Curated annotation (Swiss-Prot):
Catalyzes the methylthiolation of an aspartic acid residue of ribosomal protein uS12. It is found in: Cytoplasm. Residues 9-124 form the MTTase N-terminal domain. Residues 385-453 form the TRAM domain. It comes from the Bacteria. [4Fe-4S] cluster 2 binds at residues 155, 159, 162. One of its GO terms (cellular component) is cytosol. This is Ribosomal protein uS12 methylthiotransferase RimO. [4Fe-4S] cluster 1 binds at residues 18, 54, 83.
Length: 453
């Protein structure tokens, strides 16, 4: 047999975008491995390159187009998938094919079958699949000690600034048994922190009318509260964390807070509020826009004093008046959100918000974003300073000669702050990546904490 026949096809991979896109990439890589393909770490070593794109805002579109262009220049054989693959320009033409006509194939997001069909067409799979080489938890692109668990795909909402439903479709909830099986496999593989993600975590099960499923021989509804409770019980067996992201403030979220207070899951809630003024929320077509969010936040903190709340906001949305913006600032002063991201409104091609009157000038949008972040810096510093002197459990992400870089239950990877840990005084104590340790907080700034082991 010749070397050419023996060679294992190698696929290069570029993954862009949000954690949900990262999970799509992990699923593709897992299937590639199951079918006997190998992965390449460079363009030169790849027989073909897959680029998983993002297409939400203009900057993400440009980054994706640049990545495709680089892959074409360096390798020449490129398959494109992801959100940008489902996006059309103003004339209704495929953006990617128009800019890069030499790509081999283009698919939308969450399109494992289509991607693999394109791979098979241009790089036939090896004769002998290697399913036994694929770990039960699949191929992961995150460090071994944390992983994302996607519980659904798509979204039923039609927020005026967002085009995600046009790219990822309506809500499709995964069967609860499949979600729990993946979670168990991840914990068995050593994952210490599970980050639950979707476009709308609170809506889990709505599309299947909260159908009854089964896990470990017990009936469990396809519903957010029952899923969270089951994940919490499972995580306890492995001494692991469960963190919730993209939670809309629907009434049933109140039932999750006691679970956090009891330690079943992390007291951390990522709630994308986007604004506070009711008129702006109406223009945004936000779900749950009628909720009295200040009262909800106060009630949550009364039930769970250690609760950390993360949220995102948009400054300078079309029609936002000075009074509406000041209303937002007043809300933030009262709410004292722990972790906050603010974006100056950016028109997204295809979003209905583009047709709203009274667009806010770009310089005003940026100025308002800056004011929000300046206020948040004061709030964050105050809330972090209150933690000095306390002992808390942290998860180590990095270890170096200066000590370690860890995260507390209040810190999600990549988007929140970190805890810098000094080396232990006792020589026999060593910091290890992926392990929990208890530390005493000795200092704080507006973003991070410092601690001693």
């Amino acid at each position: 047999m010749t070397n050419a026949l023996q060679a294992t096809p190698k696929i290069g991979f570029v993954s862009l975008g949000c954690p949900k896109a990262l999970v799509d990439s992990e699923q593709i890589l897992t299937q590639l491995r199951a079918e006997g393909y190998d992965t390449a770490k460079s363009y030169d070593g790849a027989d073909l390159v897959i680029v998983n794109t993002c297409g939400f805002i203009d900057a993400a579109v440009q980054e994706s187009l640049d990545a495709i262009g680089e892959a074409l220049h360096e390798n020449g054989k490129v398959i494109v998938t992801g959100c940008l693959g489902a996006k059309k320009d103003a004339d209704g033409d495929d953006i990617i094919q128009k800019v890069h006509p030499k790509v081999l194939a283009v698919t939308g997001p969450h399109a494992l079958g289509e991607v693999m069909d394109a791979v098979h067409k241009h790089m036939p799979k090896p004769h002998a699949p290697f399913i036994d080489l694929v770990p039960a938890q699949g191929i992961k692109l995150t460090p071994k000690h944390f992983a994302y668990l996607k519980i659904s795909e798509g979204c039923n909402h039609r927020c005026s600034f967002c085009i995600i439903p046009s790219m990822r479709g309506d809500l499709v909830s995964r069967p609860i048994a499949d979600v729990m099986m993946e979670a168990e496999n991840l914990f068995k593989a050593g994952v210490k922190e599970l980050l639950v993600i979707s476009q709308d975590t609170s809506a889990y099960g709505v599309d299947v009318k909260f159908r009854m499923g089964f896990w470990n021989g017990k009936p469990v509804k396809t519903h957010m509260t029952q899923l969270v409770e089951a994940l919490g019980e499972l995580a306890k067996q492995y001494g692991a964390w469960v963190r919730l992201h993209y939670v809309y403030p629907y009434p049933h979220v109140d039932a999750i807070i006691p679970m956090m207070a009891e330690g079943k899951i992390l007291p951390y809630l990522d709630v994308p509020l986007q604004h506070a003024h009711p008129d702006v929320l109406k223009r945004m077509k936000r779900p749950a826009s009628g909720e009295k969010n200040i009262e909800r936040i106060q009630a949550w903190r009364a039930m769970c004093p250690d609760l950390t709340i993360r949220s995102t906001f948009i400054a300078g949305f079309p029609g936002e008046t000075d009074a509406e913006f000041e209303y937002l600032l007043d809300f933030l002063k009262e709410a004292e959100i722990d972790r906050l991201g603010c974006f100056a409104y950016s028109p997204v091609e295809g979003a209905t918000a583009n047709d709203l009157p009274n667009a806010v000038p770009e310089e005003v949008r940026e100025e308002r974003r800056g004011r929000v972040m300046l206020l948040q810096e004061e709030i964050s510093k105050k809330r972090l300073q209150a933690k000095v002197g306390k002992t808390m459990r942290v998860l180590l992400d990095e270890v170096n000669r200066n000590g370690g870089v860890a995260r507390s239950g209040a810190d999600a990877p990549e988007i929140d702050g970190v805890v810098y840990v000094k080396p232990p005084y006792e020589p026999h104590l060593k910091l290890k990546v992926g392990e929990f340790i208890d530390v005493k907080i000795t200092g704080a700034d507006a973003h991070d904490l410092w601690a001693e082991a």
